């Protein structure tokens, strides 16, 4: 489902600037966050590059919106999803992720996210699972180059001519 592009008419004027400013609203996926399209796209790229094999378990150090999106995308694509997180991660979040079909492995609370990442990396190596490592994975920006950027340019075009001068994105 294409994501809407809206013009933020009052923002530039309020800042005393000229031009036009648009926002790409990537919320049409099942979790309602921009992470849905990223998780699906990264899984597709990993499979295309034969880094992710059919039915291969996926492991990731995450507990937020990307974890939710990955749990759904992985299950839909036929991959078990295992999430690593510190043992003191919020119980309600863990329960939600379990209901989405993910499995959870805990790392020591005192090691924080670094401990969860180390557990994911070690487990992937030992068991032959695919470690997504989404924030450091080149498939993340590649997905946006292939899909998000062209979608924005196409949406903000007139008579086949792009009206886009600059694209600014948030990271994280």
Tell where the protein language model's regions lie, with residue ranges.
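PLP-dependent amino-acid enzyme catalytic core
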Residues: 1-172
